[in-house]
Amino acid sequence: MSDIVLEELARRLGELTILDVRSRHEFDGSAGKPCDPRQGHIPGARNFDVYRLMELSPEEVHRELNLEPGAEVIAYCHSGSRSAIATQVLRSLGYDARNYVGSWHEWSRHDDLPVA
């Protein structure tokens, strides 16, 4: 499956499972990057740190995500690197995972897009 771009993600915001694979502090906006004009996360996203994702067994990941096998999952981080790793892990576990390459670095620059 291909990466997802800003326009598609914004259009499908309420229907997608979105994983923010940044740290908890980046997710809640208490420790973001100074290059981003806004802090927080994409509304509806669940925080699942990529390092934790890599530490868990496949069974633990399936249990925590609680998604059907083959479910479409979008991963994002700050700039697309951690989410690329998460996407590969999720694909290896049978999910239809897509990377939002622009990630928070792109999303936070669009004042017309919601932030949680």
PLM feature segments, named:
Residues 1-17, 21-74, 78-116:
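Rhodanese-like catalytic fold shared by cysteine-dependent sulfurtransferases
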